[in-house]
Regions:
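Catalytic beta-strand/loop signature of glycosyltransferases that borders the donor
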Residues: 145, 212-219
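Short aromatic/hydrophobic "clamp" motif used to bind/position activated sugar donors
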Residues: 113
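Glycine-rich, basic loop-to-helix element that forms the pyrophosphate-binding segment
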Residues: 91-108
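A recurrent flexible, glycine/aromatic-enriched loop bordering the glycosyltransferase active site
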Residues: 159-177
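Conserved donor NDP-sugar-binding/catalytic core segment of glycosyltransferases
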Residues: 125-156
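Acidic donor-binding loop at a coil-to-helix junction in glycosyltransferase catalytic cores
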Residues: 194-203
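N-proximal low-complexity "stem/linker" segments adjacent to membrane-targeting elements
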Residues: 1-45
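Acidic donor-binding segment of Leloir-type glycosyltransferases
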Residues: 47-89
């Protein structure tokens, strides 16, 4: 099933299994691309989670401008016993954010993955709060409110899950706990120029009749800087993206 959804070309850089995973094990999947300065803050926030039954999957999307991969491998080796399984893989060539997330799902063996980029952070109770809603209550995904930090400070735009809310724009960030079965149902993330992969992913949830739940607590930290999706807002490709999104999801009213 997984191979039919996504075929990935990557090399295993590090893999350590402390003990066998079980139905309650959650994988935190980190997408890494040239974030040498931020990656350690991200990983420390994962290490400090109160939810102990965690695996870690770092997918390096062929970083070349800095020592991101080397730092990630060294940190993971030093902290591998904290996790059920700690894994670092590297794409053979740069494949984009959507493919990095697909690689994480395809290479993991847990029922759910928490998705985050290497420049972001999570508060210690994030996974503990989200886990029961996906593992026990059966929601396809669970997400919280964001805290912006970096170049911009403030609260995010997350709200209660409603298909109607997606008609005009995306309001749910990638940082969410997602069931592997839901990822399979929507056939993974689709690469879209300009960074609208997350919007498309959640719209595929709507298309498939999947339910997610919003937890109104501030548990995820989104770093805003010059290259973040929040700041660039994909302006250069905005009109083309609107056309593509409305072709993929005709019920959208974005751009009207």
């Amino acid at each position: 099933m997984l191979n039919r959804i996504y075929r990935s070309k990557y090399n295993l850089q590090f893999d350590h299994v402390s003990h066998t995973s079980n139905d309650d094990t959650i994988t935190v999947a980190v997408s890494l691309y040239n974030y040498e300065k931020e990656i350690l803050d991200c990983l420390e926030s994962i290490k400090n989670q109160t939810y102990r039954n965690l695996s870690l999957m770092i997918v390096d999307d062929c970083s070349q401008k800095d020592n991101s991969l080397e730092r990630a491998i060294l940190w993971t080796k030093r902290n591998s016993e904290r996790f059920v399984r700690a894994t670092v893989v590297r794409h053979e060539f740069n494949q984009g954010l959507a493919q990095a997330r697909n690689t994480a799902f395809a290479a993991s063996d847990t029922r759910a993955l928490f998705i985050m980029d290497a420049d972001n952070m999570i508060y210690p109770r994030a996974i503990e709060v989200l886990a029961p809603w996906v593992l026990d209550e059966g929601y396809a995904a669970a997400y919280t409110q964001l805290e912006f930090f970096g170049d911009v400070s403030g609260l995010g735009y997350a709200d209660y899950w409603s298909p109607d809310f997606f008609r005009e724009n995306n309001y749910v960030d990638a940082m969410a706990l997602i069931s592997t079965s839901a990822w399979q149902t929507v056939r993974g993330y689709t690469h879209m120029e300009g960074g609208w992969e997350d919007y498309d992913f959640w719209c595929k949830f709507v298309d498939s009749g999947l339910d997610a739940i919003f937890i109104p607590q501030i548990l995820c930290r989104y770093r805003v800087h010059g290259t973040s999706m929040l700041r660039t807002d994909t302006v250069n490709n905005h009109n083309d993206l609107i056309v593509e999104m409305r072709m993929r999801h005709p019920w959208l009213a974005v751009g009207s």
